[in-house]
Each structure stands twice: as C-alpha cells, then as structure tokens.
Amino acid sequence: MITGPISNLSGESGFENVFIFISDSLRYDALPERIRSKGLTIKTIAAAPWTASSIPSLMSGKYPSSHNVWMFEDRLPQRPPLLSEQEDWDAGFDSEKHWLKFESSEKPPVKMLRLDGEQKLADIEPPFVHVVHDLGPHAPYGFENDEYETGPYFRDYNDPKDLQQKYQNDAEKSANYFLEILDKLENLGLREDTLCVFTSDHGELLGEGGRLGGKWGHSTPLCPELLEVPMTFIGKGIPKGETLSGVASGVDLAPTCLSAVGREIGHVDGIDLWAETPDEDRRVRSDVWQRYNAFGRELPVYVASGLWDNDGGWVKHRRSKLLRMAYYGYDVFLGDYAPPARSTTGISELVSGLKFWGRDWEKFGNTTISLQEAQKELSDELVRSEDSVELSEEQTEHLEALGYV
C-alpha cells in the first residue's frame, strides 16, 4: 500500500493522451491479476450500482444527485468536458463489443452523454481521450449480448458455481481486450505518452446470501458488492503492482484524467488523484433511482443513497418500503435472474433480504461514519432529470433483453 498523488509517485509532469477502459459489471475482487500487476490500483466506490447513472458520473465527475441522470432515457445537460472535442483535442467513445443490438448513434451511453456517435481508436489523432465501454463480465455470462437474452439464458444456465466461474472467465476475457488495445497503442507509438485507466461502472451480485438475499445481477440494492470496483492507472513511471491507499469514487476519474493532460477540470464532485491524496477519513457517495413502468404508471421501486468510507458505509432507503420489498421478491422469483436466485435464496435468505429491503437505514462493514453523520450528509432530496426522452419500442425491447428494464 502506497500513498501520494499519482504525479508524485510516477515522477511525470503529465501525459499527452488518455485511454479509459470501462469493463462493465466488474467487481473489485474480480480484477484480473494481469491488470493489477501492470499499474497502480485504488479501491473505488461506484457512483451508482448500474450503467444508466454511473457512466454519466464517470465521464462528468459528478454524482447522480448532481447530474440527475437516473434512467436510460435521461440526458446530461451538456456533453462532459472530458469528451468535449476542441480544436486541439480529439475525443472518442467506443462500445463496439457492447449494446450490439443498437445502431451506433442510438447506443444508450452515446445518447446520455450527448455524443454524436462512436469513434474508433484508429480515427482519432493525438492529443486525445479515448473511452472504450466493454461488455466485461456483464450477464449473460459466457456469451455475447447479441447471442443470448438475459432471461432465457438463465433458464438454460442456472448452476450458481458454474455461473460464478463464467463471470470470472468473462473478467479475464475483458482483460485480454484491454491488453490488446495497449499493444495497439504501443505499435502506434502512443503508449509512452498515454495515461491508461482500467475501471468499471459498477459491480455484480453473484448469489450472496444473508441480507443480500441470494440476489444476482445489479441495479439494486446499494451494497459493497455492487459499488466496490477497481481503478487501475497504467503509464510511464506509474508504479506497477501497487495499491494506492485510501478510497476513490467513480467521480474522481474525469478530474484525474483532465489534470494529467493539463486540461481545465471545471466544477466536479470528485477529486484530482493526479495531484491530490485522498484524506484518510474521506467519505464518498452513491445514489440510485430505479423506476419501473407497470399498471399504466411509473413506480419508484428502489430509491436509495449511500455514504461510504474505506471500511464500509451507510445506506439510506427512500420512498416506499412495500415497493422495495416487492421488487426484491420479483427479482428473486420472477425476474430474469430468478433461475439461479432460486438456488441461492432459501428461507433464511428470503427473510434476511426482505428485512434489509424494508429497513430505512442499513450499515455495512466497520465504517467510522456514525448514523447521525450519514443522516446529515444524505438529507437532500433527489431530483428528476429535466432532460429526458421517450424510448422507442425497439430500444425498450433491447434493454429488456439485457435485463435492464
């Protein structure tokens, strides 16, 4: 474990380019050793437990409670500075192995971030920032998303141990893709001048028992398994195989990368890890506002906020207790992930899960944050996005196939 701003640890004044690789659904404890050994890793708390809110946070440096992007139909107010093209700055976003049933310009991250479309690494010139959003170990495990729909997949493949192994195999597969891109940068003569970052938008539940109730997948609830993700920095001079002390947030990614290339950071919720050291008692936030359309109306089935330090945190459940509990029951018995959940959700898990989903406050780990401090920090009300669009029937069907809606 080492301490200090990344710039001091690397001995470098900065980089010309940035390459960010987002491996979807990759938990901190599933980070392949091949990635960890190449750079400096810090445990990171995702800003949200699913893509719709976490990708906007990664790219903007703002918590969901600031940018108000909760669902896939919501939009950031403007393109984030990290991805804003300027005369002397090329920005690209590529998800060629994700969202395979969508046209490039209609892919959810492209729309949420207000981009015009995707760009390939070969199409951009230095100086640049290039972001790859990879499928990673996202369900359905072991298959591309254009081959299997999540629901039918889990009816065919529902052995918990086999699924957990497939998940880890997909993490390794995602690492291979990342390393292939590093080789491309090397062959193009760009590796030495590029800060490379391997991270994830959120984690994944793999049938954990106790209060998590044997649940699979992501989106809900707020818990360490869905929020603790890796952030590994790789580049010239950056220590290899080391862990950076403290806790980071997904909202630190944008300011850190902008600082490393000497760009203006602007107003963000995160800190600049390139030039700053996280405080030992740092607290970071996470939020989720999961909505579901049923019976001709929109239901806030899971709304929550969390406050975390390096040892745990508190979760504040908002809105209807009955809706939360009902949504948990739906997930484990009727939802796309129900087949494996039936194997990991016994009576004790069901009772524990219902109790957790029903409580207003829940403590995780050995956090030094008191309940009173959490209540004060999370006393604000969450606000709906002012900029949303209606998804087409085809878009909704594609998102349903991926288990999102």
Curated annotation (Swiss-Prot):
It is an enzyme of class 2 (transferase). Binds 1 Ca(2+) ion per subunit. Pathway: Protein modification; protein glycosylation; Cell surface structure biogenesis; S-layer biogenesis. Ca(2+) binds at residues 24, 201-202. Keywords: Calcium, Metal-binding, Transferase. GO terms for molecular function: arylsulfatase activity; metal ion binding; transferase activity. The keyword Calcium applies. Its cofactor is Ca(2+). Pfam families: Sulfatase (PF00884). The keyword Cytoplasm does not apply. One of its GO terms (biological process) is S-layer organization. Disruption phenotype: Impaired formation of the tetrasaccharide present at 'Asn-532' of S-layer glycoprotein Csg with formation of a tetrasaccharide that is not sulfated. No effect on 'Asn-47' and 'Asn-117' glycosylation of S-layer glycoprotein Csg. Belongs to the sulfatase family. This is Low-salt glycan biosynthesis sulfotransferase Agl7.
